[in-house]
Amino acid sequence: MIRHRLRLALSAAPVTATGRRTRSKTAPRRSLSTQQTQSSASSSSNNLDGDGRAFVPLRKQLKDESKAKRLTGRGKRSKSASSQVEGWELTVGIEVHAQLDTDSKLFSRASAAHDDAPNANVALFDLAFPGSQPWFQPATLIPALRAAIAFGCEIQSVSHFDRKHYFYQDQPAGYQITQYYEPYARSGALWLYPHDGIAPEDGDAVRVGIKQIQMEQDTAKSQELPSHTVLLDFNRVSRPLIEIITLPEIHSPATAAACVRKIQALLQSCGAVNTGMEMGGLRADVNVSVRRTGQVEQHGYEGVSGLGQRTEIKNLSSFKAVEDAIIAERDRQIAVLEGGGKVEGETRGWTIGSTETKRLREKEGSVDYRYMPDPDIGPVVVGAELVERLRTSMPPSPDELLRMLTQDPMYMLTVEDAKPLIELDDCARLEYYLDAVDSLVVLQRDAAAAAAASAASTVSATGKTVGNWVLHELGGLFSRADAAWDGERVPASSLAAIVHLVGTKQITGSTAKSLLSTVFAGEHGGRTVQEMVEQDGLLLRPLAQEEYVSMARTVMAQHPQLVEQIRQGQQGKIGFFVGQIKRMGERGRVEAQRAEEAVRSLL
């Protein structure tokens, strides 16, 4: 059933209005003193700053700074980077902001494409022109609902939008439209397991509650030049986001990073998003607090009480940044409290390669943001029929796929092999693997039918063997060629044919790898695998046992000292004789196992 649902999800048109799969890189926002909006032409054609110096992108500056710190030893990881600090309890809550996979923006019909020129996709409302009105785009709701279903949330039949007021250069209206009071989804959960990367002390599973998921609009992308000039790209304004708010139920940095990683995987698997943290499509804010073990403090949030004073670290753009920033802030708060100080509620920042967080501003509360219902946007009404239709069309989750690949008798992969198939190439490698197993099953059935009449060799290749070839042999070819995954380069049926031939001992393992390389390089001349094997004389000619023994006797007579060493217990040297026998026989036609058996019989 899961396999069938996977096929439908990957091949059939989904019940959604998803857009093109485009990618963009998002530079971190910084607090700047001057603002300037420039067009695509001026920002792309001029690579000099206002003082005539070469312009260096902010992301490259940060990477260079991080590298310099590592070289000088100033960027070393905290000595207390373990998951726990004796005598202290860490508590973390996470807010994940994810860009939805849609064609249009949330409140205008402007394109939500990621790779267009700066300020090319901007409506009047995006720039807060006087008199412009928000126009909610219903299609943006579909991927948001898919995300809520993936987290097992209770989808609200009616939700409303609110205004969150603040003044910053990336928000021209002076407020952000979000869903503070009545979000569209509540009360979900996320389960984390050891294979997700949780801390060992968290045991076999961790349940992280999802308080709510709300839709909201994104802000502009800002870029600071060295001359105190700020470039603003309003393409990103009003792109649809969802904010996933977890309960503060995480108690280790590693588990917090695993939580964000699992959230991204779920969002991608259900088709809600098409870019992750690595491309700027997902950002995380973390709330960090500490308290002495067993002590009840006076603070709390999201319905959880008894916590220490929390601080919020904004705009973390990688899984490692999530873990490292939490470690640094935990250590800072513990040092403050042990020194007799008081942790202040504030918003802090984290820089790549840093060893400490930095204060940005005092932590705002709901009163500071002056939340109010947006009078220009009506309620969002979601019917039960739509929710059920989306629910039944959902593809299997990563956990369901993992169970299928590791527990189904047809596959029986290890967790270490199953996870890359699920996580790599947007499931394209997994689909290729399933096709290859299907093709191999057909070949096995044909061979079994022929065996009843001609006593053919028994087929022993399994889904586990196919997994090894897909991940390691074929994956290695792509890696060495520095090429992106392309299943058409070696059709799944061709790989299955190679695995079948070597599994039935019609060709040797080295011949199989050579065939795979030939097909990968496109040097097969349009021939099938079977035609290459037959026409190039690659079929394994079975040697009689007497021939193996004769070759073994010859090579052993040439190395009597090695024979004596093996008899004295140095069994590893048998491989030398096997190699010599393979060289004596016709190239690629000696079975290593039978050669070893012949050597052992003479010992």
Curated annotation (Swiss-Prot):
One GO term describing the cellular component: mitochondrion
Compositional bias per record (Low complexity), positions renumbered to this chain: 31-48
Reactions mediated catalytically: L-glutamyl-tRNA(Gln) + L-glutamine + ATP + H2O = L-glutaminyl-tRNA(Gln) + L-glutamate + ADP + phosphate + H(+)
Assigned keywords, A-Z: ATP-binding, Ligase, Mitochondrion, Nucleotide-binding, Protein biosynthesis, Transit peptide
InterPro entries: Asn/Gln-tRNA_amidoTrfase_suB/E (IPR017959), Asn/Gln-tRNA_Trfase_suB/E_cat (IPR006075), Asn/Gln_amidotransferase (IPR018027), Asn/Gln_tRNA_amidoTrase-B-like (IPR003789), GatB (IPR004413), GatB_Yqey_C_2 (IPR023168), Gln-tRNA_amidoTrfase_suB_CS (IPR017958), Gln_synth/guanido_kin_cat_dom (IPR014746)
EC number of this enzyme: 6.3.5.-
PANTHER family: GLUTAMYL-TRNA GLN AMIDOTRANSFERASE SUBUNIT B MITOCHONDRIAL AND PROKARYOTIC PET112-RELATED (PTHR11659), GLUTAMYL-TRNA(GLN) AMIDOTRANSFERASE SUBUNIT B, MITOCHONDRIAL (PTHR11659:SF0)
Protein name: Glutamyl-tRNA(Gln) amidotransferase subunit B, mitochondrial
Organism: Arthroderma otae (strain ATCC MYA-4605 / CBS 113480) (Microsporum canis)
Phylogenetic placement of the source organism: Eukaryota, Fungi, Dikarya, Ascomycota, Pezizomycotina
